[in-house]
Amino acid sequence: MSELVTGVCRALSHPARRELLRALSSHECDVGNLSEGCGLDQPTASKHLAALRAAGLVSVRIDGRRRCYSLAHEEIVRPMLELLGRLEALEEQLEGAAPSPARAG
């Protein structure tokens, strides 16, 4: 697997990063509003945004003292988010259908 693909997969592996990407899928946002909307403290959100930026999934625009983030390559990121959402829904469905350990035997 290429370094690019590995980096993107690694960046998408953390739930907070996926949540940040979902928040950015509707509009550009500064780190303060992103962290508040995703329930993260600002340093944690900044750390995750740096990882997403390093993977090429988000871009940043400096506006005075504010850093405004947006999706980079929306045509790629949006379908990835849709696929991840479907996988998460499938996981929840499978967890709900799994027999409890007491009944499984």
Describe the residue ranges of each PLM region:
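N-terminal helix-turn-helix DNA-binding core of bacterial DNA-binding proteins
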Residues: 3-43, 63-76, 105
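Short, hydrophobic-biased segments on the C-terminal half of alpha helices
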Residues: 49-50
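Alpha-helical residues within the helix-turn-helix
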Residues: 36, 53-54
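Amphipathic alpha-helical dimerization/coiled-coil segments
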Residues: 1-4, 22, 72-105
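Residue-level detector of secondary-structure transition/capping positions
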Residues: 28-29, 53, 84
